[in-house]
Amino acid sequence: MALNDITSKGIIMRILVTGASGWIGSASVTELIAAGHHVLGLARTDEAAAKVAQLGAEVVRGTLDDIDGLRAAAARAEGVVHLGYNHDFSQMGAAAQTDRAAIEAFAEVLAGTGGPLLIASGTLGLVAGGGVATERDTPNPAVHPRVANAGYTLDLAERGVRSMVVRFAPTVHGSGGDHGFVAVLARIAREKGVSAYIGEGLNRWPAVNRVDAAKLVQLAIDKAPAGTVLHAVAEEGIATRDIAGAIGKFLALPVETIAADRAKEHFDWLGMFFGANAPASSVLTRELLGWTPTQPTLLEDIAAGHYPGK
């Protein structure tokens, strides 16, 4: 099938994916290829290159801080899925600057083409006071230096780029990876001998299975209009005491509450996140793209043993 043919699956394109060997990226590569796209996967290491090749994508060696390389890679594609990011909390400012430079390089190539540019963001911290965050909410730039990059990306619609921002739930779960916040919670529970939650544990976390998240990425590339914000959220909010309870049940550990002033001591850096009340909706995303999550829930994945805490 020739590239750019219009089929029942959408417009077949060459898509550059950064973070192609990562937790969400690798699943997204699989979904994009299944939809008929030709994927060029950015790989920094030999290990990443082998994984990208195994997924069926064309390997492009490079790094996120090699701007000339990113520009050249994007020039070989008709769209970009930018999922790669340095999540080192000790260098948040530098990571956001690197991210911005990469997005600007992609924008330079895609400007005036109408090609898609999808970048990743998050739902955490969108709404103060525990209200349910929607796609229409605008995040406060003070929450994270990365926030401004999302705004810049959406504004690229005015330059002829089909730009979109996918805000992922803070918990992107699934089998085969033991990744993310829940994996850290399970490790802490095993180390401490107790699965804990903060206070009453009624604060809620949204979640999405990685396969459902990847399907959303594919649908967005195929169908999302320019300047669109999407929420990769399958479950609006799971009470943190239920998350702790599921971890405790699987690990056969007691489940206990701890006071908020002990959260940092018990959970270390994760305490500030696990104490957040941050439910998020994806109603508008589902209506726009016809996205319907079908994969196991977070509690089902914990019960299935995907987070052994090792």
Set out the residue ranges of the language-model regions.
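A conserved pocket-lining segment of Rossmann-fold NAD(P)-dependent short-chain dehydrogenase/reductase
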Residues: 187-208
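N-terminal Rossmann NAD(P)H-binding glycine-rich loop of SDR-like oxidoreductase domains
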Residues: 15-35
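NAD(P)H-binding glycine-rich loop region in Rossmannoid oxidoreductase-like domains
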Residues: 41-104, 108
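Glycine/proline-rich active-site loop of Rossmann-fold NAD(P)-dependent oxidoreductases
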Residues: 147, 173-183, 191-192, 219-230, ...
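Conserved beta-loop-beta element that borders a ligand/cofactor-binding pocket
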Residues: 151-175
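Amphipathic terminal alpha-helices
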Residues: 296-310
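Mid/C-terminal beta-alpha module of Rossmann-like enzyme folds, strongest
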Residues: 11-14, 195, 214-270, 277, ...
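Conserved Rossmann-fold NAD(P)-dependent oxidoreductase catalytic core, especially the SDR/UDP-sugar
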Residues: 38-40, 86, 98-144, 164
